[in-house]
Amino acid sequence: MNFQLCKKGVELKRMFVLFSHKLTEKQERDVKESLGVLSIIYPPWEVQRILMDIPAQAENVKEIIKPVIVWLESHLTVNDYVLIQGEFGTTFLLVDMVFRKGGIPIY
């Protein structure tokens, strides 16, 4: 697992959450305990809204989720976890991108 190093040399594990709702407190505790995650990161509302509104019959999902990909690429570092759930095409594209960038997708 890859971590972001703090000034004191402590490694921080991060997890991005990419789906239509927030984790419950119990789910957040479970993630922190089971994966050692210290930081859970949600996208800004404008990115979150895109993930919530993808039509099931969308012709070009890649174009629709472009802002999601741009946001994630600008924040993702090697070995960050990314929890992904949603429309199949969106999930596939995001999982592929996370793998290519050295992240760890959970889907």
Question: Where in this protein do the model-derived segments appear?
Answer:
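N-terminal glycine-rich "phosphate-gripper" loop used for MgATP/nucleotide binding
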Residues: 83-89
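An aromatic- and histidine-rich active-site surface loop
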Residues: 89-95
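Long, low-complexity, Lys/Arg-enriched
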Residues: 1-80, 96, 100-107
